[in-house]
UniProtKB/Swiss-Prot annotation:
NCBIfam families: FGAM_synth_I, PRK03619.1
Listed name of the protein: Phosphoribosylformylglycinamidine synthase subunit PurQ
Localization (cell): Cytoplasm
UniProt-annotated catalytic positions: 85, 202, 204
Assembly behavior: Part of the FGAM synthase complex composed of 1 PurL, 1 PurQ and 2 PurS subunits.
Species whose genome carries this gene: Carboxydothermus hydrogenoformans (strain ATCC BAA-161 / DSM 6008 / Z-2901)
Enzyme Commission identifier(s): 6.3.5.3, 3.5.1.2
SUPFAM superfamilies listed in its UniProt record: Class I glutamine amidotransferase-like
Any GO CC annotation of this UniProt entry: cytoplasm
Broad class of where this protein is predominantly found: cytoplasm
Catalysed reaction equations from the record: N(2)-formyl-N(1)-(5-phospho-beta-D-ribosyl)glycinamide + L-glutamine + ATP + H2O = 2-formamido-N(1)-(5-O-phospho-beta-D-ribosyl)acetamidine + L-glutamate + ADP + phosphate + H(+); L-glutamine + H2O = L-glutamate + NH4(+)
Function: Part of the phosphoribosylformylglycinamidine synthase complex involved in the purines biosynthetic pathway. Catalyzes the ATP-dependent conversion of formylglycinamide ribonucleotide (FGAR) and glutamine to yield formylglycinamidine ribonucleotide (FGAM) and glutamate. The FGAM synthase complex is composed of three subunits. PurQ produces an ammonia molecule by converting glutamine to glutamate. PurL transfers the ammonia molecule to FGAR to form FGAM in an ATP-dependent manner.
InterPro entries: Class_I_gatase-like (IPR029062), PRibForGlyAmidine_synth_PurQ (IPR010075)
Pfam family, one: GATase_5
Gene transcribed to yield this protein: purQ
């Protein structure tokens, strides 16, 4: 089992993801530089940060980097891909997930803990959670206001592609619990095949008690369990 953490110019959460996978979970993990187009891993992590300075818009330039051609091929072949924060934005720009990110409704950068409700635990990324489980995970973004067309939203809901929604500590999905104005309180979605996840909150920042919480562990544990079953391809 081997994880690859992609490093773009401007990434700043790559080391966090690498640390959690390699040192907390003891899994073989390598960095993948944005210019690389030849690598062999079982799961690709697109980390948070400000790839290419977020010029034009978040993820717009990163999606044209050499590594993304390989990431798209990997995903289309059934490989697991998780995009966190800026990584989610890049997945949207690359067309691996539907929709787009807008500026936060408040126009402010938001950096604090939020609550997420697990809407679908029948995915490679949430199998160790239970449906309706509430997770406390931090966010740090200025463009996390997810948007898609009404027909796309209906399809996401019908297909179970909405994986996480912002909620309060009791698991109630409310407007007050939404930190950025995201449509339908969406915090994370998967593609139709179920092998590509994009989420705005940072599970790598709450996978050790020393950081104040471990709710993010369930996502990494789910991925590891899926890969251990040998079902990551096809």
């Amino acid at each position: 089992m081997k994880f690859g953490v992609v490093v773009f110019p401007g990434s700043n959460c790559d080391a966090d993801c690498f640390h959690v996978l390699k040192n907390v979970f003891g899994r073989e993990t390598v960095y993948i530089w944005h210019k690389e187009d030849n690598f062999d891993v079982d799961c690709i992590v697109l980390p948070g940060g400000f790839s290419y300075g977020d010029y034009l818009r978040a993820g717009a330039i990163a999606r044209f980097s050499p590594v993304m051609k390989k990431v798209v091929e990997f995903a289309n072949a059934g490989g697991l891909v998780i995009g966190i924060c800026n990584g989610f934005q890049i997945l949207l720009e690359a067309g691996l997930l539907p929709g787009a990110m807008l500026r936060n409704k408040s126009i402010n950068f938001r950096c604090h803990d939020v609550y997420l409700r697990v809407e679908n635990n029948n995915t490679p990324f949430t199998s160790k959670a239970h449906e309706g489980q509430v997770l406390k995970i931090p966010i740090a973004h200025g463009e996390g206001n997810y948007y898609c067309e009404p027909d796309t939203l209906k399809k996401l809901i019908a297909n179970g592609q909405v994986v996480f929604r912002y909620c309060n500590s009791r698991g109630e999905v409310t407007e007050d619990a939404n930190p950025n104005g995201s449509l339908y309180n969406i915090a994370g979605i998967i593609n139709e095949k179920g092998n590509v996840l994009g989420m705005m909150p940072h599970p790598e920042r709450c996978s050790e008690n020393i950081l104040g919480g471990e709710d993010g562990r369930v996502i990494w544990e789910s991925i590891i369990a899926y890969l251990e079953r040998g079902a990551n391809r096809g």
